[in-house]
């Protein structure tokens, strides 16, 4: 006896129904709120069913994660499937397509019965992959914030010290700090440099480099001084201007530190997965893009052939043929994960 539990998950509640082959309804669609009492009641009900029971739900957003964790921790078979598979599934032979929580739960239950032997059980490794994906999305979010903060600082420097962001091209340190950012924190206005003599600035710059742990060069000091001599600043050298620039630097440094910490933690977590050494051995992939690729692909073993992975990324050309018409060149479907496509693009851009 097969029991298919279909769960349509929302933020604060889920709609649950239980079906058996032959469209037998064991439990009509009902709402279960996400609290300990109602979840435990649902667990007891599912465990009390006769026969084999499998729970199926869509892995949409983050809402499904508490439910799948609670049920799987209770020893119940739970499978979280791609919502596109549920959307494209239709066994009703009807033109009606109701979009309600009850209808969705029933559709998920019917899908579970139809794909009974193919349902993959959610496990501890899936929790690691979900955590990795969340960290990667946070990494992308803070990278966007870092870019915005960097552009904001450069815009302020255009008013106080034009071109100062181009004085150095050194890469970011492990803590996220960069030489040009630290430089403009101390020399936040062009008059902070040209207001001194060349000798005085060179000595001050040398002490600054030693204190910050940066390389010092007399030629570089002279170059900065000469470039600063002819610049025009729109904002005056006063406390308000100093506050604006230094505040922008502080925010940028804080965001940069978060980005670098996430970068390290993502790599550390990804290294616990079995595919990590294989992915890092690929061309164009390092300790940043490798973990991102692993995070966005998820469990690669669920793809039975390479075409399935291509379709998941949405880079497969769809067919366009009808009668005598057959298109030779088709655009990619772009039906899959945009985050995965972005990662793949960055990798290929580096290789080419």
Regions found by a protein language model. Give the residues of each.
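A detector of single, family-specific signature residues
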Residues: 1-352
């Amino acid at each position: 006896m097969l029991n298919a539990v279909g769960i349509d998950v929302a933020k604060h509640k889920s709609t649950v129904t239980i079906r058996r082959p032959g469209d037998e309804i064991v439990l009509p669609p009902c709402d279960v709120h996400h609290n300990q009492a109602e979840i435990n009641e649902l667990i007891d009900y599912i465990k009390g069913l006769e026969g084999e029971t499998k729970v199926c739900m869509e892995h949409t957003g983050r809402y499904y994660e508490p439910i799948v964790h609670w049920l799987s921790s209770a020893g119940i078979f739970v499978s979280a499937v791609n919502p596109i598979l549920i959307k494209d599934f239709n066994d009703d032979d009807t033109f009606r397509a109701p979009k309600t929580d009850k209808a969705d739960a029933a559709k998920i239950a019917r899908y579970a019965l139809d794909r009974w032997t193919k349902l993959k059980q959610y496990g501890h490794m899936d929790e690691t992959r979900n955590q990795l994906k969340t960290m990667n999305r946070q990494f992308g979010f803070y990278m966007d914030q870092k870019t915005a903060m960097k552009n904001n600082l450069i815009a302020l420097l255009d008013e106080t010290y034009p071109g100062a962001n181009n004085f150095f091209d050194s890469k970011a340190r492990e803590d996220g700090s960069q030489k040009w950012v630290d430089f403009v924190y101390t020399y936040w206005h062009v008059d902070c440099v040209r207001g001194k003599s060349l000798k005085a600035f060179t000595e001050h710059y040398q002490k600054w480099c030693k204190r910050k742990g940066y390389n010092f060069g007399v030629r570089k000091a002279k170059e900065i001084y000469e470039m600063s001599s002819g610049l025009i600043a729109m904002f005056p050298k006063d406390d308000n201007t100093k506050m604006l620039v230094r505040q922008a630097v502080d925010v940028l440094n804080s965001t940069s530190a978060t980005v670098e910490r996430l970068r390290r933690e993502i790599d550390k977590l990804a290294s616990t997965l079995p595919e990590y050494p294989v992915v890092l051995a690929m061309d164009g992939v390092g300790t940043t893009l490798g973990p991102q690729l692993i995070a966005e692909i998820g469990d690669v073993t669920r793809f039975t052939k390479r075409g399935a992975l291509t379709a998941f990324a949405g880079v497969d050309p769809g067919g366009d043929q009808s009668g005598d018409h057959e298109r030779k060149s088709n655009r990619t479907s772009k039906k899959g994960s945009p985050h995965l496509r972005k990662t793949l693009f960055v990798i290929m851009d580096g290789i080419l």
